[in-house]
Structures are given as C-alpha cells and as structure tokens.
Amino acid sequence: QVPQSAALRTALGCTKMTDLGHLHSECKFLTVEEHNKMLAKQFYLSTKQTGHANFSIPYQPPSRIMKQSLATLYEDEIQGLYTQNGNNAAQHKIGLRAIHTEAVAASIAAAPPNKVLQLPAPEISQSESKLPRSARSTLSQLRSGYSSSLMQYLNRIKLNIYDPHCPRCGTVPHDTPHLFNCPANPTSLNTLDLWSNPEAVADFLDLVP
C-alpha cells in the first residue's frame, strides 16, 4: 500500500499529509487490499468455467477450517454468479463485471468523508481536464485541506516561520473554506465549486497564467 500511496501523491501533486481516502477518491483507485480481494474472487470464479482444470472438483465445505482458501473465503459470495453446469465465456464475463462493480461500490461506501466538506466527496467535473497540471494539483491539494497555498497548513509544518492568519483579512484559520468566505476577497463561489466548477475556482484563485 505504501508504494501505491506514494505514486498517487506524486500523480496528484498532493502533500505527504494528505489522507489515503482523498488519494483514492481523486484517482478512483481501489486500495491494494481491495484490488487483491477483487482479483482473488475473479480468479476463483474462473474455476467455475467448464473448460477450467479445476471445474471437475466440486466444492465441499470442510468440517473444520484449518487454513483459509479461495473457496472457503469466497464461495458464498460468488454462488449466484455461476451455474452448477459451469459458465460459458459470456456468463463468465458477466460474473467478472459483477464482481468489479461490487468491489467499486463497496470501496465508495467505505470511503471516509472528505475533510474539507465533512461529507462524501462528489464527482469532479470533467471540465478540470482543460486546466494545466499545476492548477489541477493545487485544486486537489485544496480539496484535501492540505495545501501550500494555505497559511494554516504552512504554519502546521513550520510553526515558527509561517503565521496561520489570512494574509488578506488577518483572521484565522486560513484554510480551504476561508478562501471562499474571506471578507477581503468576496466571491459567489463556495467550497463545493472545487468539485463542480473547478475552472471558475482556478480563475478566482489566479491559478491559470
């Protein structure tokens, strides 16, 4: 998981303080554990195809589980995805898709609330893809709540150097919500626009040269 998290941070341009939930929400990646479980279920489902070498070996629940296997772990979960006579190629593809859909839905349901919104993170508008990488990285940082554009964050990592007050109005904390509520820089935009209207936010924050 550590190498994957580091790669996602690099791809997004986020800070080391950024939580795992934000990284996976932004990149739409399953965690390593979730992905491995999904692949294990899909592999076990493949043994239910008529042409598979293990198809002729029926599953029999052990009287006592001494050691977990794919069968003891996932048999109950995939029972509805195959027939006793075995799956053909079309049925197998449908089963693989169902396992993938279930894994993604479970990951989304288990995701922690976004730290800025205190709610599940909504979908990011496709319009963000039109922005340069530097602007998209800053927007992702702001959605995480940890950004070098925020005095609160800079004060947290270098307490004796940076002041947590807003450089425009002098109030604290200078965090992501404050950017849209600063009396010295009024706007009709709000925090949700970081997701729904990233182009307008990038323009408001002068992120695009």
Positions of predicted regions on the chain:
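Helix/loop segments that flank and initiate small ligand/metal-binding modules
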Residues: 82-172, 197-200
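Intrinsically disordered linkers and flanking regulatory tails adjacent to Zn-binding modules
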Residues: 194-208
